[in-house]
């Protein structure tokens, strides 16, 4: 029996559909424990939709007890309205994470694609294929939002070590954290 080193929650936020995925990491091995999607009806008032996202994400966190979270940032494309709605859903999910004091790393869509596929411009099918391969799944996770959430969790495993090393380097060289890097060193944060 292998010991789980840590449990990672990946989140792909969206007002209509917020995908989530649980990845267990033991050394360099990754395994998918569960995934799903919180869907909200378009005819519900906005506040009710956000409450549903928050409550269901809080339930996922309570059930699987992740140690950390990888979440996709909002991408401002052509549709600004959609970006605002996604940002609100993202906020509801982040509050659920904050209630449990979970470490959260945020990734752009291109960072996630680069970590999972090796190319920041990869298409959705390439990401889904690699999620399936990296997690040794029999099929591509469905819906798409769940596959994207699993990709965010996988991305966390590749970036988390870098963020910690960068934080140590910031502290060692007395470099202030300007919000660009996840420097956890108090030396940098005190000077902002």
Which residues are covered by each model-predicted region?
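Phosphate- and other anionic-substrate recognition elements at nucleic-acid/protein interfaces
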Residues: 1-192
């Amino acid at each position: 029996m292998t010991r789980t080193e840590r449990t990672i929650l990946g989140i792909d936020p969206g007002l209509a559909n917020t995908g989530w995925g649980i990845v267990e990491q033991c050394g360099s091995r990754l395994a998918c424990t569960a995934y799903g999607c919180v869907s909200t009806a378009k005819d519900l008032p906005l506040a009710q939709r956000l409450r549903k996202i928050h409550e269901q994400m809080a339930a996922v966190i309570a059930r699987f007890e992740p140690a950390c979270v990888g979440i996709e940032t909002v991408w401002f494309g052509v549709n600004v309205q959609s970006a605002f709605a996604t940002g609100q859903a993202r906020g509801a999910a982040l509050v659920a994470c904050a209630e449990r004091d979970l470490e959260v790393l945020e990734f752009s869509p291109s960072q996630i694609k680069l970590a999972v596929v090796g190319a920041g411009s990869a298409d959705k099918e390439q990401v889904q294929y690699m999620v399936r391969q990296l997690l040794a799944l029999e099929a591509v996770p469905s819906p798409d939002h769940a596959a994207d959430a699993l990709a965010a969790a996988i991305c966390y495993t590749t970036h988390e070590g870098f963020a910690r090393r960068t934080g140590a380097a910031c502290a060692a060289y007395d470099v202030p954290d300007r919000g660009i890097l996840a420097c956890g060193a108090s030396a940098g944060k005190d000077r902002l």
